[in-house]
C-alpha cells in the first residue's frame, strides 16, 4: 500500500515538473513567428527586422509564417489556438486585436485580452495629418479654426471604413469638436493620390509612403499623431502639443504568445526583444522605415494593449464607424 502511494506521489511530482522542465530547456528547436501580413509587404519587412537579433539572443532560428487575410484575423486565430509552449510567437498590429473587436458584428474566434500574452511593444509607426497645399491652414490650430468655421465643408480620406487611419480621423473630430466628412477609399495609395491632386483635402497617413510628396511640396504635414515628435520629421510638432492634448493615433507592432505560455519564456523573449530593439543599428533601421523603436516591458505592453482596446471602443461607439 505504502509502495503504491509512493509511486503515485512520484508520478504526480513528475507531471507537475514537466512544464517547468520544458520551459527550462526552451528553446531546443526553431521558433515559429506568425505574421498577419503578406510576405514582402512593408509591415512584413518591419516585423522581420527583429528576427536576426532574437535568433542570436535565443540561440534558435525564427521562422516566419505569413498568414494574411481577414484583416489579420486568420493569423491571430492560428496564434491564439497554438500550443502555449514558446514555439509559436505572434507579431501583430492593432487591426485584428484592438480595432476589429469593436467593429465586427459577429464575434471573433478569439478574445484579445484572454487568448494572448503580451510580450513587448516593438515599435510604433505614427500617422501624420497631411493636407493639400491649397488648404489655407499652416498648422493644427488653424485647421481646427477653419473646420469650425466651415462645418461639413472639409473632407478627409482613408484607406477604407474601419481602418486605423479612418479611426484616427474620427478621433481627431471627437477631440476637436469639428465636423469633417470622411471619404473612404479602397486602399491608402488612392487616397494619397487624391490629396496630392487636390481632389481630397486631407488624411492621416504613415510617413514613409509620402516622404517624396513632402519633400516635393505636394503635401503639407501639419502634425505628428504620436505623443513624441518623429525622428523622420523632427521639426513637425505633434498634434498633442498643437492644441489637442493627449491626441495619439499610431500603428504599432507588438509581440505576443498564446495565453498560458510559461512566464519564464515570456520574460526571456521580452529581454531578447528589448536588447535587440535598443541596439543603435536596429533603431536606425526602424526609423528608416518610418517606425519609432520601443522595446517595452511585459507590464507596459499589457497596459498599452488595454488602453488601445478602450480607446478604439470609444471611437467606434461615438462615431458609429462600420467596416465594409
Question: How would you name each of these model-derived features?
Answer:
Residues 1-4:
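N-terminal secretory signal peptides that target proteins for export/translocation
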Residues 6-17:
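Bacterial N-terminal signal peptides
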Residues 22-115, 153-155, 161, 177-204, ...:
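N-terminal (or domain-start) structured segment
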Residues 28, 47, 51, 55, ...:
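Extracytoplasmic/secreted envelope proteins and their assembly/folding machinery
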Residues 28-30, 175-178, 215, 238-241, ...:
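An extracytoplasmic/periplasmic, membrane-proximal ligand-sensing/linker region
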Residues 81-86, 94, 102-190, 239, ...:
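Hinge/capping helix and adjacent helix->loop/strand transition within the periplasmic-binding protein
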Residues 97-105, 166, 171-175, 202-236:
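A ligand-binding cleft/hinge motif common to bilobed small-molecule-binding domains
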